[in-house]
Amino acid sequence: MNTYGWDIVYGCSKRVVNKHLKEYITKNNIQFLYSNIDKKQEIKMVFDNWEIINGGSSNFLRIKTPIKEGYFKVRNTTVDLSGINPVLEIKLDFFNDISNPNIKELKFNFGSESNDDIKIIVSDLNGNLQEEDEFYFNKLLINAFIQNEKQISYIFASLNVTSDIEWMNPKQFKFVYYSPTDNSDGYLFILSVVTNRDISKLSANVDGNILGNNSEVGLLISEKLFLQNMVLSRLSSNMGSNINKNNFEVISTSDTTGRIVNNSTLNWYGLKVAALYYYPKINNFSMQLFEGNKLKISLRGLVRLTGLEAVYSDFEIQSINKFVYNSTNKKAYFEVDKNPTSSYKYHLFPGDLISLAVLSSVTHWSIKSIEGALGFELINNFVDLINNTIKWNNLKISQVTNVTLNVGFCIQGNAN
């Protein structure tokens, strides 16, 4: 999955938003009144349930705003608006939460005195409004929205820019609406970067695969953030106490991609062969994503015979470790490669057959030990990750439905 240069992409299904938007409109009995005394014009609208429909783009949502009952007056003429169903495009924007400026709320933004933030797409989807009435209705409708903006305080999403998981905290972000070409449900997306870098040239494209058919929300993390914050901390979990995450670092290959290398010699734990312990060392280690859902690990090292430091073998290993998510126990891991490739070269005194036999055995078990440790499990905090920075429609996600790795790392989930 593609982040298109963004660090983290958050997505929510249109059908989920519509459910909660409907509840909001019903509960709050939304109605607008606007009048212009000088022009002897007035409009009143009591709204039925609003519904987001496909067709929105960038930071505009396309919405059906059916009028349950209402009217507009122009001079001495009154036009009944009951059953009229306007289709509008309304801009969404981020605003600071009143009590906590570190919470950015995604809300309607149609309070501008200009008409740029709200557009009428269809005056009446039901076709009941007379053509000669549309001109006045359209002008009054927009003015009514502008004057009554404070009545609509619905929050589509709350973004926490100072969350407990610091590496996820967005520094810059924007909202986009994604409308699939096959006319299936659209999605609301928030695109974010976690560093202060220029985003003016980043694409507003999104990957619709972030949300599955059975998921309400999705979270897509870039390759580099995944390696830095989810792989690096677990990579050494099977390598013994002498090796930890501080022995590795992520080398950037772009703003959103990278690879893991060692920054110091990796001192493997002691391997007992016969009566003695031997201690392999890895001098060169490289790990990168491969074919989207695998880790390709290449390393070179050596192991010396204890007491005979001049007798040693160089070895190389290449391992392909596939990502697996177990939906039953909710665990994600990189499995051990069943067919890794390896090579080695012995360094010993000519004719020393005893050392050769020992070195052969020590090299074999060193390689097997390292190959078996290159599979590891990720920390199972997927619910925390998907809830950490964002709340869609004030929902808390309690169920992870799927976790995938396909260049980007994706978590999908549902609320209760």
Curated annotation (Swiss-Prot):
Keywords: Virulence. Part of a crude toxin extract that includes BoNTA2/NTNH, P47, OrfX2 and OrfX3; OrfX1 was not detected. InterPro entries: Clostridium_P47. Pfam families: Clostridium_P47 (PF06597). This is Protein P47. An elongated protein with a middle beta-sheet wrapped around a long alpha-helix. Structurally similar to tubular lipid-binding (TULIP) superfamily proteins. The N-terminal domain (residues 35-175) folds very similarly to OrfX2 (residues 6-168), another protein of the same locus. This structure is very similar to OrfX3 in the OrfX1-OrfX3 complex from P.bifermentans (AC A0A5P3XKL3, PDB:8BGM). The keyword Metal-binding does not apply.
